[in-house]
Amino acid sequence: MKIRRLERSDYTNLIYLLEQFQASCGIKSIEQGTSNEEHVRQVLLRCEKGGLSYVGEVNGKIKGCILSIIVPDLWMPQTLFLREIAWFVDKDYRGTSMGARLFAAYKKEAELWQKSGRIRAFTMAKLHNSPNFDYEKRGFQYIESQYMSGE
């Protein structure tokens, strides 16, 4: 198992993994949606070039990822935040160290970006059906809940 930064050559394998994420997220309107591969590729490019993203690779196949993008603060555009948008591990690799190793690599680099002033802070999200992961124990502060209309 290898944890490394996202590269453009990963996109096709990663799109397949993200389709698994879409199908298992527990939100009907997303699970039943039609994905637009070109849009997903553009988001991945933004994650690769203007964010911080890692993949978990096993035998040349992408089996896990943590993807993030940099976004400006609403009131202070020069203040940037790193926002995690997907953290997913293939069901056959859950229970291994892949998820923890992806998180550790992401957090370590994000902390360096924060110390250097490149970003002000970084965030992690948790879906309602995500595994129980104690972010506060890992130095994060609980700041919000999000709700979605529709099914």
Enumerate the predicted regions with their spans.
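A short beta-loop-alpha structural element at the N-terminal edge
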Residues: 2-16
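Conserved GNAT-fold acetyl-CoA-binding loop/helix
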Residues: 22-42
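A short helix-loop-beta-strand connector motif used in the catalytic cores of GNAT acetyltransferases and
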Residues: 42-55
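Conserved beta-strand in the GNAT
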Residues: 55, 61-70
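A conserved beta-turn-beta hairpin within the catalytic core of GNAT-like acetyltransferases
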Residues: 73-84
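A short, internal acetyl-CoA/4′-phosphopantetheine-binding micro-motif in the GNAT/acyltransferase core
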Residues: 85-96
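Conserved acetyl-CoA-binding loop-helix of GNAT-fold acetyltransferases
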Residues: 95-109
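Conserved beta-strand-loop-alpha-helix junction that forms the acyl-donor binding cleft
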Residues: 106, 116, 120-133, 150-151
